[in-house]
């Protein structure tokens, strides 16, 4: 398995891009807001964009090394790059699109293209043109074309952004299977936390031009560590906080003291609670830990859950978000949060 080593800098219009990470096998996600440098990172790895300094290596091969004056063209990098738009050739058939990226003799190219069409269930569409294909079919053609070349590394840039929401879930299952069969390093760029969670073993959170957090995907959602990571993984409730005990923090924007199941660091600047982690509490219970009296501000009912905006009734400050399953017919007077579900965050 070839190790991808990335360590480069590039000055962008609004901020410097400094990317440093290693990847070896599996599927890795880069989660970040629009404009943070995700796509530019991909372009540098693929050879479409040129860094100002640093190096990019894949195994023992230098794809880019400013000091050694190495900058391989895209066709020599063995990097498969799936663009957001899929970048199919509009005047070529499905068969021709897949065959176009394959090197070798005509008979071998034809055989490989037919093999990939069968694998991706495209044989019946062989003579069709991209304009007549659905978004899901276009994605399969683009992926078949890339994998037909047997790349050493696969880059997927927002792979589902061009698809209708009802198609995404089915295609995510398909893609997960294709990536498993690919068996080499895949990196997915996305701002969609659900895509990242479903597909990626490890996730890197990107701020403006740098990787801020890198860890196992499930661990990232459990303990995101940084405010930006908490927001990008879907945490609606984030308050400024200060330590007020070994296992206690005061959430300044909510006016409530919270107990956690671990020691509170002096570096903590914020605290987070996911909207699904509030649970109804009994007002008469002696268990007062992390119990908050509810003053409802607004509520919205969706087909399968409620979204409720509420304040701490005894010290009303900023709103908090709570989500409840539709089976709960009444909004609770009190809610409670498990100490282990509270997120301790740094700016």
Where are these regions (language model features)?
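The short alpha-helix immediately C-terminal to the Walker A/P-loop
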Residues: 43-44, 202
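Catalytic "switch" loops of ABC-type ATPases
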Residues: 48, 76-79, 83-91, 192
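ABC ATPase nucleotide-binding domains
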Residues: 78, 93-228
């Amino acid at each position: 398995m070839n190790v991808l080593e990335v360590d480069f800098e590039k000055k962008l219009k609004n901020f410097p891009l400094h990317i440093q990470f290693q990847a070896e096998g599996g599927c890795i996600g880069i989660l970040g807001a629009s404009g943070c440098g995700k796509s530019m990172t991909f372009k540098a790895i693929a050879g479409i964009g040129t860094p100002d300094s640093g190096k990019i290596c894949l195994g023992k091969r230098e794809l880019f090394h400013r000091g050694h004056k190495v900058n391989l063209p895209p066709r020599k990098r063995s990097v498969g790059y799936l663009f957001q738009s899929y970048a199919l050739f509009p005047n070529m058939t499905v068969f021709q699109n897949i065959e176009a990226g394959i090197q070798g003799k005509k008979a071998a190219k034809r055989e490989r293209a037919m093999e990939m069409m069968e694998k991706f269930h495209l044989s019946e569409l062989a003579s069709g043109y991209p304009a007549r294909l659905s978004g899901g079919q276009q994605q399969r053609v683009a992926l078949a074309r890339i994998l037909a070349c047997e790349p050493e590394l696969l880059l997927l840039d927002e792979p589902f952004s061009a698809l209708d929401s009802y198609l995404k879930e089915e295609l995510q299952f398909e893609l997960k299977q294709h990536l498993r069969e690919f068996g080499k390093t895949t990196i997915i760029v996305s701002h969609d936390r659900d895509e990242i969670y479903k597909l990626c073993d490890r996730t890197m959170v990107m701020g403006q031009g740098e990787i801020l957090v890198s860890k196992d995907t499930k661990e990232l959602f459990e303990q995101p560590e940084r405010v930006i990571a908490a927001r990008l993984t879907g945490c609606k409730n984030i308050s400024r906080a200060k330590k007020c005990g070994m296992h206690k923090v005061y959430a300044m924007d909510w006016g409530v003291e919270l107990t956690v199941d671990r020691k509170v660091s002096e570096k903590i600047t914020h605290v987070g609670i996911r909207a699904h982690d509030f649970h109804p509490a009994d007002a008469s219970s002696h268990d007062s830990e992390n119990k908050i009296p509810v003053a409802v501000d607004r509520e919205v009912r969706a087909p399968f859950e409620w979204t409720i905006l509420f304040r701490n009734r005894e010290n009303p400050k900023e709103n908090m978000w709570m989500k409840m399953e539709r089976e709960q017919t009444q909004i609770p007077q009190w809610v409670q949060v498990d100490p282990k579900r509270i997120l301790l965050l740094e700016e």
